Amino acid sequence: MSASVVSVISRFLEEYLSSTPQRLKLLDAYLLYILLTGALQFGYCLLVGTFPFNSFLSGFISCVGSFILAVCLRIQINPQNKADFQGISPERAFADFLFASTILHLVVMNFVG
């Protein structure tokens, strides 16, 4: 059982490293960072508490929103999805990501108080 799991993981890593464009790898690293940051915030909330509740919610909403926006960007700039997003260039997708991210963080900063 464990040998097949190791085989699947190693094959996945080989294919990911060989066939994924560098832009997507960079975006995946950003997604991993956001995921770990959100998990760390949630763990802190469970262990220590949520005394400044608005601050916790703002940080966590920022992580979740940023993750969703980055996943949308990844989907749009993936070369395999080019047929689905014919009218949207990677530069336009990135500009949309920056605009939406700016709006998200303005809302988050407003929520902090």
From Swiss-Prot:
Keywords recorded for this protein, A-Z: Acetylation, Apoptosis, Endoplasmic reticulum, Membrane, Transmembrane, Transmembrane helix
Subunit architecture: Component of the oligosaccharyltransferase (OST) complex. OST exists in two different complex forms which contain common core subunits RPN1, RPN2, OST48, OST4, DAD1 and TMEM258, either STT3A or STT3B as catalytic subunits, and form-specific accessory subunits. STT3A complex assembly occurs through the formation of 3 subcomplexes. Subcomplex 1 contains RPN1 and TMEM258, subcomplex 2 contains the STT3A-specific subunits STT3A, DC2/OSTC, and KCP2 as well as the core subunit OST4, and subcomplex 3 contains RPN2, DAD1, and OST48.
Function: Subunit of the oligosaccharyl transferase (OST) complex that catalyzes the initial transfer of a defined glycan (Glc(3)Man(9)GlcNAc(2) in eukaryotes) from the lipid carrier dolichol-pyrophosphate to an asparagine residue within an Asn-X-Ser/Thr consensus motif in nascent polypeptide chains, the first step in protein N-glycosylation. N-glycosylation occurs cotranslationally and the complex associates with the Sec61 complex at the channel-forming translocon complex that mediates protein translocation across the endoplasmic reticulum (ER). All subunits are required for a maximal enzyme activity.
GO MF annotations, alphabetized: enzyme activator activity
Stretches that traverse the bilayer: 31-51, 53-73, 93-113
Family: Belongs to the DAD/OST2 family.
Highest taxon listed in the record's lineage: Eukaryota
Localization per Swiss-Prot or TrEMBL: Endoplasmic reticulum membrane
Keyword Transmembrane: yes
Pathway involvement of the protein, from the record: Protein modification; protein glycosylation
One Pfam short name: DAD
Official protein name in the record: Dolichyl-diphosphooligosaccharide--protein glycosyltransferase subunit DAD1
Segments on the Lumenal side according to the record's topology features: 52
Ranges per topology, Cytoplasmic: 2-30, 74-92
UniProt cross-references to InterPro entries, sorted A to Z: DAD/Ost2
Bilayer topology term: Multi-pass membrane protein
GO CC terms: endoplasmic reticulum membrane; membrane; oligosaccharyltransferase complex; oligosaccharyltransferase complex A; oligosaccharyltransferase complex B
UniProt GO BP: apoptotic process; blastocyst development; negative regulation of apoptotic process; protein glycosylation; protein N-linked glycosylation; protein N-linked glycosylation via asparagine; regulation of protein stability
Residues recorded as bearing N-acetylserine in the entry: S2
